[in-house]
Amino acid sequence: MQYNLTRIDPDAPNDQYPIGERETVSDPLEDQVHKNIFMGKLEDVLSGAVNWGRKNSLWPYNFGLSCCYVEMTTAFTAPHDIARFGAEVIRASPRQADFMVIAGTCFIKMAPIIQRLYEQMLEPKWVISMGSCANSGGMYDIYSVVQGVDKFLPVDVYVPGCPPRPEAFLQGLMLLQESIGQERRPLSWVVGDQGVYRAEMPSQKEQRREQRIQVTNLRSPDEV
C-alpha cells in the first residue's frame, strides 16, 4: 500500500498551503521490518494499538455553517447513536478535539476563523468536509463563498450530499476510522521521523461504479 508522507516545513512562508511538503512513499514499517525484524514487528504492534485507541475515541469539534449541521446533529440522537463509534463527546474547545467537521457553506469571511480554530487543535487531528457546499462550494459559485474547504484546510474525508443524511456522515466517520487505523505516526514527539504517513484510501465513488451501473430499478426515496 502506498502512503502520503507529509512533513512540516518551518521555513515555508505563512501564506503557503500546505505549510510543508508531500511525497508518495511505501509503508515505512515494511522498511523497518527489513532492517530489524524484532523492532519492526514491535513497532507494528505498538502502532496498531495506538491507532486502535485513536480511531475508537474520536472527539469532534463541530463547526456548523448551514443546513448540513442539522443533519450532523441528528447523528447524535438515539436512532443513529454515534456513541457506537466513540465520537459522541462534542468538545467546546478545539484544543480538546481530535477532528473537526465542517458542515455547510463556508464564506470567505469565515475561512480565517476556521483556519485559526484548526491551528488550535493538537496533533493528531483530522478534518471531515460534510456537504456539497463544504466540498466544492455547492450551488454557490459566487464571489463570497469558498469553493471547497480544502482550499485552506487538509481534508481527510469528503461526505457528499445536499444535505447528506446522518447515515452518510456516519459512513464518513467509519472511513476516517479506517484511515486512522492504517496511519503511521511517530510514537514519540522527540524520537524518530516526525513525518505523518497517511494511507492512500480508494475512492468510494470508484469502488462502487460497477455496482451503480448495474442498477436498473430506481426506487423512490421513500422506499430506500
Curated annotation (Swiss-Prot):
Residues 1-20, 201-224 are annotated as: Disordered. Residues 203-212 have a biased composition (Basic and acidic residues). GO terms for biological process: aerobic respiration; electron transport coupled proton transport. Residues 213-224 have a biased composition (Polar residues). It is a peripheral membrane protein. It catalyses: a quinone + NADH + 5 H(+)(in) = a quinol + NAD(+) + 4 H(+)(out). Keywords: 4Fe-4S, Cell inner membrane, Cell membrane, Iron, Iron-sulfur, Membrane, Metal-binding, NAD, Quinone, Translocase, Transport, Ubiquinone. Coiled coil: none annotated. One of its GO terms (molecular function) is iron ion binding. NDH-1 is composed of 13 different subunits. Subunits NuoB, CD, E, F, and G constitute the peripheral sector of the complex. Belongs to the complex I 20 kDa subunit family. NCBIfam families: nuoB_fam, PRK06411.1. NDH-1 shuttles electrons from NADH, via FMN and iron-sulfur (Fe-S) centers, to quinones in the respiratory chain. The immediate electron acceptor for the enzyme in this species is believed to be ubiquinone. Couples the redox reaction to proton translocation (for every two electrons transferred, four hydrogen ions are translocated across the cytoplasmic membrane), and thus conserves the redox energy in a proton gradient. This is NADH-quinone oxidoreductase subunit B. It comes from Pseudomonas fluorescens (strain ATCC BAA-477 / NRRL B-23932 / Pf-5). The gene is nuoB.
